[in-house]
Amino acid sequence: MKTFAYLGASAAALLLTTSHTPIQGCTRAVYLGPDGMVVTGRTMDWREDLRTNLYLFPRGMERSGADSGKTLHWISKYGSVIAAGYDIGTSDGMNEKGLVANLLYLTESVYTRPDDTRPVLGISIWAQYVLDNFATVREAVAALEGDTFRIDAPDMPNGARSTMHLAIPDSTGNSAIFEYLDGKLIIHEGRQYQIMTNSPSYDRQITLDDYWQQIGGLVMLPGTNRASDRFVRASFYINAVTQTSDPHLAVAGVFSVMRNVSVPLGITTPDQPNIASTRWRTVSDQKNRIYYFESTLSPDIFWVSFDKLDFSAGAPVRKLTLTGGEIYAGDAAGEFAPAPPFKFLFE
C-alpha cells in the first residue's frame, strides 16, 4: 500500500502486531484551549456493569496503601470527587485543585521485581493517593519518580487482572503518564501527552501516532475499536474541534470526541473477546472545577460543581448513588448524601 511507504520498519511492525491484540477499553484525552481552558475527557469501557458510584472525599482523611505490612500512610491534603468501580477503588476523579486522575487498562503492566521489598501501594488506591496528595503534575512526578514503592494488584471481582496505567493532567494542561513495565516505573511528562488508551505500552503508542500524524486526519483515520485506532482518532479530534475559552463549547467538544472513540453497547468481536462496551464517560472542566458524568444507560448528563461542595477536614464523606437506576440531570452537587467510605480492595 502506498501509505506504508512512509512508515518506518518499527512502526510497521507495531501495526501488524497490534492488529491482533485483544483489547480492554478506555480512552482519555486532554483539551488545551485558549485562556487556560483545560478539559479532560475519558471513557470507561468494560465488559460488565462496574456498579459505579460517585464519592466526595474531604481533606484530612487518614489513608493506608494496604491492610497490613510495609505500606504507605498519609492524610489527604486535598478533597476530591471520584468515580468508584465496584465500590472497591478509585478509577477516575478530580481534586479541588483541578488535578485529574484517570486509571485505564494496560495488559503489559508488570509491577514487581524479583525479591521486591519496597513498600506496597494497592492499585485500588493508586489514583486516590495522587488526588489526595498533589495539586500539580510536577508535584506528583517529583514525588513518584524515585520509584520507592511497588503496586499491589489483586484480581478484580469479576476475575479480570487489574493491570492498569495512570494518566494525570493538571489545571495548567501539563500531563503525566505512569506505567509499570517489568517492575520499573516509566513516566512520560509534558503537555504533548494529551492522549492515552490501552495496549501497547505508551512509547509504542506514540510511534504509531507519529505515523498517522504524517498522513493527516483529514486524509484518513483508522476506524476500529482497537486501542491504537482510538488513540489516533482522539489525538486528531481533540485538537480539531473548536478551540475556545467558552466552557460550554469546550466541554461539548470534549464530549463529542469521547463519543467518537466509544464502543457501542453490546458490541462483541469474536476474534477479540476483550473489546468492551463503553459504560460511562466523564469530562472534567479543570479551570472551572466541574466534573461531568454521562452513563450509557441514562438519557441525561449531570455535573458536580465543586464550588457547591464542602471539602473541609471533618466534613462527612458523601456519596451519589448511581447503581439503583437513579437518573440525574443538571447540577447534582446537592444530591450527595453522607455515607461511609468504601473499603479499598487490597491483596
Task: For the regions a language model picked out, list residue spans one by one.
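Structural recognition of the beta-strand scaffold that forms the well-ordered cores
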Residues: V39-G41, V100-L103, A167-P169, I177, ...
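Positively charged n-region of N-terminal signal peptides that target proteins for export
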Residues: M1-A5
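A contiguous strand-loop segment
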Residues: Q24-R118, I151, A329-G330, E335
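Compact, glycine/acidic-enriched structural inserts
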Residues: Y55-H73, V110-F149, A315-E326
